[in-house]
Amino acid sequence: MELYLIRHGIAQEQSPDIPDGDRQLTKKGKDKTQRVAQRLQAIGVEFDLILTSPLVRAQQTAQILMDQGLAPQLETFSSLAPGEDIPQGINDLKEEYRHRSHRCLALVGHQPDLANWAEYLTFGSPQGKLIVKKAGIIGLTLPSWDCPPGEGQLFLLTPPRWLV
C-alpha cells in the first residue's frame, strides 16, 4: 500500500476578510501545482483515489491532480482538515478504505497535519521533525491496512522544486 501525502499549493495569505477554509490557490500556486502534477505523471505515478481536505485550497490542488489524469476518482475526506486528530483520522481512513482494492492513494491536506500523519505512520507518534513545503510530497509504504503505527516506510520526501 502506498500513500502520497501532498500539501496544497501556494494559497492566498490569511486575511480577516477571507475565512481560512475559503482561501484559494494563487496563480503561482496553481502553476506550481500543475507542474508538480505533470512531473508525477511523467514519472509514471498513478493513484487509485485522491482524498482531499474539505478546504478550498486543498480541493483545488486535488482537482489539478485529477485534471492531469493522475487518478480516476476524487473524494473529500474530512479527517484531512487542519487540526483533526491524527490517530482518529488514520483509523477513519483504514475503516473507510481497507475493503476497497486501492493500492495507491493520494491524500491532499495541510502542514503540519500531513507531516504528523507521516511521522505517526513511520515512527509511531508525531515527532515535529518533518516539514512539507507547499505542493510538496511525502511518499509512504505501508505493509498492510492493518499495520500498527510505526510500521510505515518513508520512500519520498520532496519539495516541489525537485519536481518542477
Curated annotation (Swiss-Prot):
It is an enzyme of class 3 (hydrolase). GO terms for cellular component: cytoplasm. InterPro entries: His_Pase_superF_clade-1, His_PPase_superfam, Mito_Ser/Thr_phosphatase, SixA. One of its GO terms (molecular function) is protein histidine phosphatase activity. GO terms for biological process: protein modification process. Its EC number is 3.1.3.-. Keywords: Hydrolase. PANTHER family: PHOSPHOGLYCERATE MUTASE-RELATED, SERINE_THREONINE-PROTEIN PHOSPHATASE PGAM5, MITOCHONDRIAL. Belongs to the SixA phosphatase family. This is Uncharacterized protein sll0400.
